[in-house]
A protein has these predicted regions:
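A short, Lys/Arg-rich alpha-helix, primarily the initiator
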Residues: 1-23, 31, 102
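Short alpha-helical DNA-recognition segment
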Residues: 23-48
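DNA major-groove recognition helix of helix-turn-helix
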Residues: 33, 50, 61, 80
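Interfacial/linker helices and their anchor residues that mediate assembly or domain coupling
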Residues: 80-114
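The DNA-recognition helices of helix-turn-helix-type DNA-binding domains
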Residues: 36-37, 53, 80-84
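Short, basic-rich loop-to-helix N-cap that marks the start of a DNA-contacting helix
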Residues: 40, 51-67
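Short, solvent-exposed amphipathic helices
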Residues: 64, 75-78
Length: 114
């Protein structure tokens, strides 16, 4: 029997899969996500995000996507390659950061079983 390799978890794939699980169309989700000027994002922009052709341009977009899709914003920030604002404000010295990052990696490897 052949092993199935799971698809890589990406920001776009997570947005698309969760949107579909909630029964939302791209048009419906795009209407709920607003740019900084208050206008909704376009269906095409959301499509590009979902297919990992573009990244969200602002932290506020990630926070809105998390809220509408009922996802943890920290998880979306992680998938987008960003740190949440509260973490960025409290950046420790390099040694403390290395220790925290190492602990984070260990936690991911052992599935949080510690």
């Amino acid at each position: 029997m052949e092993d199935v390799i799971p698809a890589k978890r990406t920001f776009g794939r997570t947005i698309m899969e969760t949107r579909k699980e909630l029964g939302l169309s791209q048009k419906e989700l795009a209407a709920h996500i607003q740019r900084e000027d208050g206008t909704p994002i376009s269906n095409q922009y959301l499509n590009d995000i979902e297919h990992d052709r573009r990244s969200p341009t602002g932290r506020h977009l990630i926070e809105q996507l998390a809220k509408v899709l009922k996802l943890g914003p920290d998880y979306l920030f992680f998938l987008a390659g960003q740190f949440p604002e509260d973490v960025r404000r409290h950046t420790p010295d390099p040694e403390h950061f290395a220790q925290a990052w190492s602990a984070f990696r260990r936690s991911l490897k052992d599935g949080g079983k510690r």
